[in-house]
């Protein structure tokens, strides 16, 4: 009964419809990076409407049947508190996707490069700290949320208990779970259709699927919101509403909004662009030991655009080709590169995937790659033990040579990126993002290597707006590769190079399912 009253009671249906239209407008305008007046206006309108809708919904559920102006009056009286509440709810909802608005907001977040770099280099302790704070804040909201809401709507006589809040959250999670299951079923249907239907029919199926998924998401979110507010109000008995005839125009507006969002997802560019194929750590399908000459010689036969490999500084200030900061896994020796000289490291045998090989110096690896005419993507690893000026020495010694070879350098440490560009400005230098949470323009680079799990089309578009290619690491399954291709990534860094090369030889028209899948992921 609460769901029916929350949807059909006077004023609420129109309010939900307007909220969906504003939400759709934000998705449409927020697709491309940058702040615009119309985008800010839409955000402010959605915040104001959300406050009114929740207030009007609460008063309706407790049987007050207020006029619309009365709810607006109550919202205006508590406008400061509402602003704080909505900001808090937005922050809590950001990790949950915010209905696809999270990436549209985060890609516009400018922060100092030093702060971004600190978070990236200390991502584990920072991540744990943020997770603890998030859990504490979410717990406080769970326990005190109903009392805060009562202050915003004093007519509520008995606010909900924490048990009622837990039940409401479980119901909301269940609704989203049902939506997710149905959406994945629709994705599977599109995968089946792509393989069997003509190109036009497959694209039409994708268009209809996107519309259904969007409308289903809207319904699930509205019902979850009604359940939450009903629990904030103490789950009162709700009388049967007297619905007003809203007319088909409301349904028509929702379908039009959903159609616009679906069309944007289907037709947005870039999609299925030319792909740069990059072998991760110089390995293809587990043949050879990562970052060794044997693996390099094998993978170069597949002619990747780049072979990605890693460098660590040694105790005698040389460079060894190695990814791990400890040799325990590959060489069964509990030591770091900084504890051994290059000569000692070259004598070590490393084992992986049933193969064995020797560690190799950077100069030897580079000469071998040049003989094979194989461009490299060099990742410079950093530790607190690195010598002062190591990166600048690298740039002076190898910058011009790497540029002649058509090679590039990237790093997780933005200090490396900045120093290389200052010392060797003609060298192509990129920044590796451990996760995607700020405007790429905050950390300028020649290209970006985006972490795959949290990348979105908005981050790829932001990189393109800055004139930088967007590469993604490390999709290994065919499904992940196709999804990144459908997002518009310019390159993929993968452990399965030959698989990626087969994937990008497919016709894009046979992979509309990936566009639908990306849309599902964009909602959460």
Residue ranges of model-derived segments:
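Hydrophobic alpha-helical membrane segments
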Residues: 1-275
């Amino acid at each position: 009964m609460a769901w029916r009253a929350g949807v059909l009671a006077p004023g609420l249906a129109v309010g939900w419809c307007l909220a969906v239209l504003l939400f759709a407008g934000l998705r449409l305008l927020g697709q491309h990076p940058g702040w615009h007046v119309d985008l800010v206006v839409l955000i402010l309108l959605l915040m104001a409407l959300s406050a009114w809708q929740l207030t009007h919904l609460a008063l309706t559920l407790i049987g007050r049947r207020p006029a619309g102006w009365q709810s607006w009056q109550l919202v205006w009286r508590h406008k400061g508190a509402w602003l704080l509440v909505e900001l808090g709810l937005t922050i809590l909802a950001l990790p949950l996707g915010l209905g696809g608005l999270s990436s549209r907001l985060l890609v516009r977040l400018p922060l100092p490069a030093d702060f971004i770099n600190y978070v990236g280099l200390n991502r584990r302790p920072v991540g744990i700290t943020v997770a603890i704070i998030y859990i504490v804040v979410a717990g406080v909201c769970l326990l005190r949320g109903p009392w805060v809401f009562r202050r915003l709507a004093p007519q509520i006589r008995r606010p909900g208990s924490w048990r009622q809040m837990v039940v409401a959250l479980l119901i909301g999670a269940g609704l989203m779970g049902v939506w997710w299951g149905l959406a994945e079923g629709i994705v599977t249907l599109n995968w089946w259709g792509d393989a069997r239907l003509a190109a036009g029919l497959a694209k039409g199926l994708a268009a209809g699927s996107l519309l259904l998924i969007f409308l289903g998401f809207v319904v699930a979110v509205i019902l979850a919101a009604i359940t939450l507010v009903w629990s904030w109000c103490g789950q009162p008995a709700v009388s049967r509403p007297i619905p007003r005839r809203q007319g088909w125009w409301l349904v028509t507006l929702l379908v039009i909004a959903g159609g616009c969002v679906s069309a944007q997802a289907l037709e947005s560019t870039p999609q299925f662009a030319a792909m740069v194929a990059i072998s991760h750590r110089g390995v293809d399908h587990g043949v050879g030991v990562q970052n060794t000459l044997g693996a390099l010689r094998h993978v170069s036969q597949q002619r990747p655009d780049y072979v990605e490999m890693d460098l660590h500084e040694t105790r005698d200030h040389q460079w060894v080709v190695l990814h791990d900061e400890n040799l325990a896994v590959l060489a069964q020796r509990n030591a770091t590169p900084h504890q051994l000289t290059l000569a000692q490291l070259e004598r070590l045998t490393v084992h992986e995937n049933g193969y064995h090989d020797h560690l190799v110096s950077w100069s030897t690896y580079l000469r071998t790659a040049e003989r094979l005419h194989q461009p490299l993507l060099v990742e410079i690893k950093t530790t607190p033990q690195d010598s002062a000026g190591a990166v600048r020495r690298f740039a002076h010694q190898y910058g011009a040579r790497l540029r002649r070879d058509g090679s590039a350098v990237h790093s997780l440490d933005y200090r490396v990126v900045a120093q290389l560009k200052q010392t060797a400005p003609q060298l192509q230098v990129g920044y590796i993002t451990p996760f995607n949470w700020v405007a790429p323009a905050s950390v300028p680079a020649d290209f970006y290597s985006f972490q795959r799990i949290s990348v979105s089309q908005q981050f790829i578009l932001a990189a393109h707006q800055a004139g930088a290619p967007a590469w993604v690491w490390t999709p290994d399954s065919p499904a992940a590769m196709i999804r990144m291709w459908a997002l518009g990534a310019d390159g993929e860094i993968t452990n399965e190079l030959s698989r990626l090369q087969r994937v990008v030889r497919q016709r894009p028209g046979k992979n509309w399912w990936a566009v639908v899948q990306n849309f599902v992921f964009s909602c959460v």
